[in-house]
Amino acid sequence: MNKIEEKKRQERAEHLLEKCREVLRSEKIPVSEGIIGLKINDGIRSRFGSCRKVQGVKKMNPEFEIEISGRMMNADDRAIETVLLHELIHTCHGCMNHGKRWRQYAMRLNQKYGYEIKATSGYKAFGLEDPGSREQVRYRIVCVNCGMEFTRKRRCPIVVNTDRYRCGKCGGRLEIR
């Protein structure tokens, strides 16, 4: 990606962040004014975004850094807004986890604006391809009794020592196919 594309991507993300902050303010949700940066991280593999409290900052006026996955930038604006709102809610006092207050704020936005802000979401929810779906299934473990199938992408204890395990559904013997 060249510098011009990176700049456009960053500008888009910052524009959407500001739009989300306005939505939160209009709903009287006490979003922090101490957001010091929005970073697009192409290395994130296991999440869509994060909100980090900057260390060493006073407790009265904490500062936060918001990070969004580079993959999310391939989604539509609505999906990006959903992730940014999720992270912005974390900047509210008492909302660093997905506790009661966080859920109340998310529910309020979901009901009024039709967002789908959740504690966790999958790639399908945002119309993105799951990067893990490209990996081939290397092991198929099948119950001889009921036919239940388990798949594994990596060599693991159940693959190495299949005879030590039983089917969780019926207790039958397992075999690799």
Where are these regions (language model features)?
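Active-site-proximal or metal-binding-adjacent scaffold patches in catalytic folds
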Residues: 1-82, 91-177
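Walker B catalytic acidic pair
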Residues: 87
